[in-house]
Amino acid sequence: MTVIDAKGLILGRLASSVAKQLLSGDEKVYIINAEKAIISGSRAATLREYRETRDRGATEFGPYFPKRPDRILKRTIRGMLPYKRARGRDAMSRLKVYVGVPYELKGAETTTIADADMRLLSSNKYVELGEVSQKMGSKF
């Protein structure tokens, strides 16, 4: 069981690292504090891109894109897995993503991913996933 704290981690780098970990092993991966993961880039451009992604298509026919930060993070990881095949579905079943810290993981030892740390950014342009989620209308 691996518990990863997403606070201050870059979304894409976190997602690719977790996807590799899920495909290579049999252990469960829990991600806590999903709303505190960051997306690098201009705040206005990032919010616009996520809004356009959410508004694409029709409400009856899809594509359906999540609003909540835990679901956005899980969808990002899903995009890096072969989720239509058995090994991808199996990998997704071992992943749990939470907003905040759930009761059962309060005392658990957390790890972080050094390659995904926000201190690696060359600029200070970023936005938290929770803020993106709130701008899309989420009430997490």
From Swiss-Prot:
PROSITE patterns: RIBOSOMAL_L13. InterPro entries: Ribosomal_uL13 (IPR005822), Ribosomal_uL13_bac-type (IPR005823), Ribosomal_uL13_CS (IPR023563), Ribosomal_uL13_euk/arc (IPR005755), Ribosomal_uL13_sf (IPR036899). GO terms for cellular component: cytosolic large ribosomal subunit. The keyword Membrane does not apply. SUPFAM superfamilies: Ribosomal protein L13. Keywords: Ribonucleoprotein, Ribosomal protein. It comes from the Archaea. Belongs to the universal ribosomal protein uL13 family. This protein is one of the early assembly proteins of the 50S ribosomal subunit, although it is not seen to bind rRNA by itself. It is important during the early stages of 50S assembly. This is Large ribosomal subunit protein uL13. The gene is rpl13.
